From Swiss-Prot:
This is Glycerol-3-phosphate dehydrogenase [NAD(+)] 1. It comes from the Eukaryota. The lineage of its organism: Eukaryota, Fungi, Dikarya, Ascomycota, Taphrinomycotina. PANTHER family: GLYCEROL-3-PHOSPHATE DEHYDROGENASE, GLYCEROL-3-PHOSPHATE DEHYDROGENASE [NAD(+)] 1. The keyword Cytoplasm applies. One of its GO terms (cellular component) is cytosol. Its EC number is 1.1.1.8.
Amino acid sequence: MSGYGQQGVSAANIDSIRPKKRLSIGVVGSGNWGTAIAKICGENARAHGHHFRSKVRMWVFEEEIEYKGEKRKLTEVFNEAHENVKYLPGIECPPNVIAVPDVREVARRADILVFVVPHQFIERVCDQMVGLIRPGAVGISCIKGVAVSKEGVRLYSEVISEKLGIYCGVLSGANVANEVAREQFCETTIGFNPPNEVDIPREQIAAVFDRPYFSVVSVDDVAGVALGGALKNVVAMAVGFADGLEWGGNTKAAIMRRGLLEMQKFATTFFDSDPRTMVEQSCGIADLVTSCLGGRNNRCAEAFVKTGKSLETLEKELLGGQLLQGAATSKDVHEFLLTKDMVKDFPLFTAVYNISYEDMDPKDLIIVLQPLKEDSENEGGTETE
């Protein structure tokens, strides 16, 4: 499969590559997405035994659960049932995926560390791993979002790299965890462009994740891959507002188009990103469409308009208290744009922030979609069905 610029790399020819050594895979995180990823890693560790050691360790934040009428530790239940009965019930994981309650054990034993924890915990988790990483190890971040501070916008892969002193790539795409776990076909994108001293080829990284139902393409544009997964949540909020107002498909298509352009503009303005990433890869337009057609950000934004309830209330009612990432990201992005004096350059992102936090009437979103006079004064028009 081809990417942009240079050829995208897949795992299709992995068996023709002679590995320098068999690598161990560790998964940091065990929610529904973390467990789905661990399942994939476990399957590939067995399928490519000359590339990977069979055992895949998955760090599980230890907690007690009710299981068959008894109080049991979650790790014990997983290793007995080969199923994450709390976060991904009904999905069997291969027996070579082992749950461990100590993230330090995963850190010590893995050559490839796959990070799938909620973004608000990543720094704390990395702090526990400092000084324990194997020489030559690399990371892959499956965490969607960006870290924003007064210093600027950082990718979570950058946070991991800085904390642990390793190279870290990114995996992102139109990947709903439950659908992936049920082996419904989807595509994903890996951004992996390590320095020369990293001794693990991209094909081997792709082979950690590539399955017949989980099609992987690896490209160089790490920033573009990461930002697609973060910024699409803001656009999904805008489409959710439109759903709440019962606007039609034409209007929602316009929102998605404008949103995609702002995603692309943000990535190329503030990062060294290829503009084609957003339109050619699953991490861009495909993930955007999936989120806009019914993800949690879309649903909560629709309910925000229809019920008049605050986003904080809807987070409790619809998300079990989890943070609504689209709204939070819009706030982070808005504060960053203020420091750059570029708020007006991203009108859709700004509108989502203003509706979410500044009492802007959602109906005024339509104003953002109307072209400025100077943009259209020289355009002709034709009628279409």
